[in-house]
Amino acid sequence: MLARFPLYLRLVRMDKPIGSLLLLWPTLNALWIASDGHPRWPLIVIFALGTLLMRSAGCAMNDYADRDFDRHVKRTADRPLTSGKIRAWEAVAIAVGLSFVAFLLILPLNTLTKELSVVALFVAGTYPFMKRFFAIPQAYLGIAFGFGIPMAFAAVQNTVPPLAWVMLIANVFWSIAYDTEYAMVDRDDDIKIGIRTSALTFGRFDVAAVMACYAVTLGIYVWIGIALGFGAAYWVGWAAAAGCAVYHYTLIKGRERMPCFAAFRHNNWLGGVLFAGIAAHYLMAGS
């Protein structure tokens, strides 16, 4: 078992934390806004660990669902499950175990949060199979990656206000943007094996679609900033996020694999500076 532990870590992408961070930033945005800038530390820990666990569970389930496809893709052919180094039942067991631990984390929270966690689990568990049916499965991914938003509001306020759903919509568009960049890396392989992705659906308009999704995401956060009366610190963070989006355009406009992958990875900075702007606003407002 100990000898296989490094393989399990690779299965759940512990060596690639970018995915966890893409889940974490929107969740932290929601925690800070829901609590008016004063989230309780136990909640921060619960949601941070829950994000890590559920992303890891999602990776294991994704590899299980895609095990017959990944062997045909150069980038994924050496994954532990695809290469036969671990077995399918192990991936499923790990996904179930991590999901159970994540649920244990939220047991101290209110009933509404626990009810929403069931929905979140369903969405996360079914996403890997959506690539067979949906033309833009990245939209479904955005719901899965963003469900920490309504859960955060529920945990803090014991209700899910319209603002939470607006933030979730913003996350859906952001997810379409960054995961389309990711899909542009595997475009040729996905055509051969018949997987549906937004990069294939958008076709020659893929770059324009990515930038349009960034524009919608940032536009929603303009509305949020105005509606909540955020100050200059927030707008500095927003401007930095907009700058990241412009930088991504320079990377993806040539549609080359490595620059597109770099743009995907750089979304960590976009999410991070936007959260920094929100946190800085509340910090300065309370000083």
From Swiss-Prot:
Requisite cofactors: Mg(2+)
An example Gene Ontology molecular-function term: 4-hydroxybenzoate polyprenyltransferase activity
Single GO BP term: ubiquinone biosynthetic process
Transmembrane segment boundaries: 41-61, 89-109, 133-153, 158-178, 218-238, 267-287
Keywords linked to the UniProt accession: Cell inner membrane, Cell membrane, Magnesium, Membrane, Transferase, Transmembrane, Transmembrane helix, Ubiquinone biosynthesis
Membrane topology: Multi-pass membrane protein
Biochemical pathway: Cofactor biosynthesis; ubiquinone biosynthesis
Assigned EC number: 2.5.1.39
Locations listed in the record: Cell inner membrane
Reaction equation(s) it catalyzes: all-trans-octaprenyl diphosphate + 4-hydroxybenzoate = 4-hydroxy-3-(all-trans-octaprenyl)benzoate + diphosphate
HAMAP family per UniProt: UbiA
Name of the protein in question: 4-hydroxybenzoate octaprenyltransferase
Native species: Burkholderia multivorans (strain ATCC 17616 / 249)
Taxonomy of the source species: Bacteria, Pseudomonadati, Pseudomonadota, Betaproteobacteria, Burkholderiales
Designated gene of the protein: ubiA
